[in-house]
Design a protein with these regions (language model features):
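A short beta-strand-turn-helix
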Residues: 75-102, 110, 119-123
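Thiol-/selenol-based redox modules, centered on thioredoxin-like
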Residues: 47-69, 184-219
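Short Pro-Gly-centered beta-turn/loop motif in secreted/extracellular proteins
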Residues: 2-15, 20-22
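Exposed aromatic-hydrophobic patches
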Residues: 2-8, 43-46, 163
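Solvent-exposed, conformationally flexible loop/turn segments
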Residues: 38-41, 68-75
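Structural microenvironment flanking redox-active thiols in thiol-disulfide oxidoreductases
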Residues: 102, 106, 110-157, 168-173
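Structural micro-motif
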Residues: 156-160, 175-189
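Structured interaction patches on ligand/partner-binding surfaces of diverse proteins
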Residues: 20-51
Length: 219
C-alpha cells in the first residue's frame, strides 16, 4: 500500500481526503492539508473516522452468489438429515433472503469452532428471531451437511440451509475479505443485498452470538 511507507512527491500544497463508508450509506470524511518542501520529509497522519453508534462497511459479499438450497423437509429438529436430492434447487442468496440485511454462516461439521458458534447462536435464538431476517447456514461440503443433526442445537427458526458444493462461496468470501487459504471456518457475516458487509468473523470468538444481536439491533 502507498500509505505504509514513504513516497516521493513533487513540492507543493496537498489535500489528503479519506472516508469511511457506513451501513446507512453515509460517508464519514476527513480532510487534511499539508505542504511538501524540497529536501524535507513531511509526516501526515491518515485518519479513518468512525462512529460508535454506526456500523462501518468492512467488505463486500455478492448476494447473487449461487448455492445448493436444501428443502425444509430435509432438516427436522426431531430427526437426522434425510436426503431428498431431487428436490434441491440451486438458488442465489438474494432469492432466499429477499431484499435487505441477512446473515450467512459458512460452516463445516464437528469442529470445535463451528460447534461453539452454533451454541452461541442457539443461546440468542429468540433475539435473532425478533430481528426477522434470514440466517443462511451453508455447509462447506455435502459430507459436512450429511453429518449435521439439527436437533443437537436450538438454532433460530429464521435459519435456512444449503451447501457450497463447488467451494465458490468460500472462495468469494475469502477474496472479498482478504483471507488467506480460504479463511478459518466458520465464516460468519452480516450483509445486505447492496453487497455491503457490516459484520464479519472467521473461526470462533467468544461472544459471537451477542455480537450478532448487537449488530442486528444497530441496523
Amino acid at each position: 500500500s502507498l500509505f505504509r511507507g514513504k513516497a516521493e512527491m513533487d513540492c507543493g500544497y496537498y489535500m489528503l481526503v479519506s472516508g469511511s463508508r457506513m451501513s446507512g450509506g453515509n460517508v464519514l470524511a476527513d480532510i487534511e492539508f499539508f505542504t511538501i518542501e524540497e529536501g524535507r520529509t513531511t509526516d501526515v497522519n491518515l485518519v479513518m473516522r468512525d462512529a460508535a453508534d454506526q456500523l462501518r462497511v468492512i467488505g463486500s459479499f455478492d448476494s447473487e452468489m449461487k448455492y445448493l438450497s436444501v428443502p425444509a423437509d430435509e432438516i427436522s429438529p426431531l430427526s437426522p438429515v434425510i436426503s431428498s436430492e431431487s428436490q434441491r434447487v440451486e438458488k442465489s442468496v438474494l432469492e432466499t433472503t429477499g431484499r435487505g440485511y441477512f446473515a450467512v454462516a459458512l460452516v463445516d461439521y464437528g469442529t470445535e469452532p463451528t460447534n461453539h458458534a452454533f451454541m452461541d447462536i442457539s443461546a440468542v435464538a429468540s433475539e435473532l428471531e425478533q430481528w426477522g431476517r434470514t440466517i443462511l447456514v451453508v455447509f462447506a461440503s455435502e459430507e459436512d451437511y450429511r453429518k449435521f443433526r439439527a436437533q443437537d442445537f436450538n438454532l433460530p427458526s429464521t435459519v435456512r440451509y444449503g451447501i457450497d458444493t463447488d467451494g465458490k462461496m468460500r472462495n468469494m468470501i475469502a477474496s472479498e475479505m482478504k483471507l488467506d487459504k480460504g479463511g478459518r471456518l466458520p465464516l460468519i457475516l452480516v450483509a445486505d443485498t447492496f453487497n455491503r458487509v457490516v459484520f464479519f468473523s472467521q473461526g470462533y470468538s467468544i461472544g459471537l452470538g451477542e455480537s450478532l444481536v448487537r449488530t442486528s439491533k444497530s441496523l
